[in-house]
Amino acid sequence: MTAAGPGAAPSPGRCDSDPASPGAQSPKDDNEDNSNDGTHPCKRRRMGSGDSSRSCETSSQDLSFSYYPAENLIEYKWPPDETGEYYMLQEQVSEYLGVTSFKRKYPDLERRDLSHKEKLYLRELNVITETQCTLGLTALRSDEVIDLMIKEYPAKHAEYSVILQEKERQRITDHYKEYSQMQQQSTQKVEASKVPEYIKKAAKKAAEFNSNLNRERMEERRAYFDLQTHVIQVPQGKYKVLPTDRTKVSSYPVALIPGQFQEYYKRYSPDELRYLPLNTALYEPPLDPELPALDSDGDSDDGEDGGGDEKRKNKGTSDSSSGNVSEGDSPPDSQEDTFHGRQKSKDKMATPRKDGSKRSVLSKSAPGYKPKVIPNALCGICLKGKESNKKGKAESLIHCSQCDNSGHPSCLDMTMELVSMIKTYPWQCMECKTCIICGQPHHEEEMMFCDVCDRGYHTFCVGLGAIPSGRWICDCCQRAPPTPRKVGRRGKNSKEG
């Protein structure tokens, strides 16, 4: 077998059917094979180690030919006013990064087509040529392009950052030159006749600036952060100023040692003093509402006795003491002693668990009270007037003192004695019923009613743990004489049964 010439010998990895040599392939054909547009058929085959070295040399030559400098990558603002945003041309970005099909590789980037006005604007800035004005150009957001270069092309981003720094340095230099030129022009002498006018204009501008600054401080920047103390300072609110005699400090404003006299001390009401151990306490400590009573019937009987005695003997004094409680401050010390002395003999048998004055005021019948009169009222149960009740008989209606509800006593299952008692005080219906002691309508499940006057009481307001079974009468409806109780026997009944 004869040896062929050096040009006729086939290479080890070359296909016999392919007349063209891979090493002799032109750069243009190589670019067509590497492109992803799909317009030309791609000829690919397995290469040996010798062909791989040749392909690397070819790719390096292509990159050297297609190098795009970072100075040509332009960032512009559109629209050029204050509302504009910064963009880059996709064609320039793809050439700078060396990506042939940029849209296919990064489809998630926000892009838009350039308008005709935008192309003319870029043509004036010498960003594009006249030929490119007729082509379809695409704009990308500059912040997304910068993020892409930071993540995937750090070397390209570093090169582009150097160019940006040089441009910023050049801009500052140009600005300084303009400022120096303006300073040289301003060194010219100003006419003396125009100096007062310039002074007035300067004063007017300063006044406008100060007024705007103060207005912003009062409206927009009232609070500020103190850097030294790390405290947010807020303007102090407006307060009413008391006269000087009301704020004058006394000779003994505060006690320096325990037991020393001072001007500031708590003033107790007469009812509060009855619970305090001043030689002898008049009242037992009030029962805890959460603890069950030992004998609810006995306690209610004792309370009724005390209430009856209070109703007969202590009408005037209870009114006066309730006035002191509502005012919140007791009389002076000398008047307190005399007032306490008068009350001492009259209030010994009053109800021990709550304020006797407050209960007597709320539970007593108002003198000269006249019930409400509603001429055309209807019963809320049978929906009939006073001419006929549910039994077809004429019967007068009773009316709630707080709302417009009315009803026949027979429809409400009330006796004649109860109706006569209701007409002596401001009666309340079931919807408006409040506790006589605390005056609150809450805790309906713990509210009970007197069988004589239909007044409402909370169980915890009268010292009961639960609603007693059977007949229950409040303190103000008791008729039996009161039974005295000793202070030492707390929680026990004084009478048997």
Swiss-Prot record:
CDD domains, alphabetized: PHD1_PHF10, PHD2_PHF10, WH_NTD_PHF10
Regions of compositional bias (Low complexity) in chain numbering: 1-13, 284-295
Zinc finger boundaries on the chain: PHD-type: 378-435, 437-480
Region described as Disordered: 1-61, 284-368
A Pfam family recorded for this sequence: PHD
Tissue distribution of the protein: Widely expressed. Expressed selectively in neural stem and progenitor cells (at protein level).
PROSITE patterns reported in the protein's UniProt record: ZF_PHD_1, ZF_PHD_2
TM regions (residue ranges): none
Subunit structure: Component of neural progenitors-specific chromatin remodeling complex (npBAF complex) composed of at least, ARID1A/BAF250A or ARID1B/BAF250B, SMARCD1/BAF60A, SMARCD3/BAF60C, SMARCA2/BRM/BAF190B, SMARCA4/BRG1/BAF190A, SMARCB1/BAF47, SMARCC1/BAF155, SMARCE1/BAF57, SMARCC2/BAF170, PHF10/BAF45A, ACTL6A/BAF53A and actin. Interacts with ACTL6A/BAF53A, SMARCA2/BRM/BAF190B, SMARCA4/BRG1/BAF190A and PBRM1/BAF180.
Functional description taken from the UniProt entry: Involved in transcription activity regulation by chromatin remodeling. Belongs to the neural progenitors-specific chromatin remodeling complex (npBAF complex) and is required for the proliferation of neural progenitors. During neural development a switch from a stem/progenitor to a post-mitotic chromatin remodeling mechanism occurs as neurons exit the cell cycle and become committed to their adult state. The transition from proliferating neural stem/progenitor cells to post-mitotic neurons requires a switch in subunit composition of the npBAF and nBAF complexes.
Designated name of the protein: PHD finger protein 10
